[in-house]
Amino acid sequence: MLRILTVVLALVTIATVHAELSKKKEDKTLKDLEDKIVNDVMTHKVMVYSKTYCPWSKRLKAILANYEIDDMKIVELDRSNQTEEMQEILKKYSGRTTVPQLFISGKFVGGHDETKAIEEKGELRPLLEKAHALFTNRVPVPDNGA
């Protein structure tokens, strides 16, 4: 009986240690993922978190396609095996888990509706210009009065 109890206690101890190590590994993985998200948001002038099948994400990307953005990264969350974790991390910075999420110059702008409203007020281009997110090396074409 004592031998069985000793084996059971050993198995419980091993299981506990394994669970603690797994938790530490998971925490490190989540921290690494958060660091990557923060790095992307801070280093890209325009950062979009989206899902390929989401109609609002498609509409936001269509709005942004009207601008010649030179530094934009789009992360399609549904193509990741960490979709839920990424959405929870994004919630820390945007207050929401839904997509799309647009960040310009490291600041959360909003989703489709907010971006569309900003564009309709004529404020999206100035926001992108202020972020130096638009191509500026275009050669102006002279107007010959034609």
From Swiss-Prot:
Keyword Oxidoreductase assigned to the entry: answer is: no
One Pfam entry for this protein is: Glutaredoxin
Q: List the Gene3D superfamilies hit by this protein, alphabetically.
A: Glutaredoxin (3.40.30.10)
Gene Ontology biological process terms in this record: cellular response to oxidative stress
* GO MF terms, alphabetically ordered: 2 iron, 2 sulfur cluster binding; glutathione disulfide oxidoreductase activity; metal ion binding
Cite a GO CC annotation. cytoplasm
Domain named Glutaredoxin: residues: 34-135
Q: Which residues cross the membrane?
A: none
Superkingdom classification of source: Eukaryota
Which InterPro entries does this one have? Glutaredoxin, Glutaredoxin_euk/vir, Glutaredoxin_subgr, Thioredoxin-like_sf
Residues bound to [2Fe-2S] cluster: 54
Cite the entry's keywords alphabetically.
2Fe-2S, Iron, Iron-sulfur, Metal-binding
Database matches in PANTHER family: GLUTAREDOXIN 2, GLUTAREDOXIN-1-RELATED
Family statement: Belongs to the glutaredoxin family. Monothiol subfamily.
NCBIfam families documented for this protein = GRX_euk
Q: What is this protein called?
A: Uncharacterized monothiol glutaredoxin F10D7.3
Which source organism? Caenorhabditis elegans
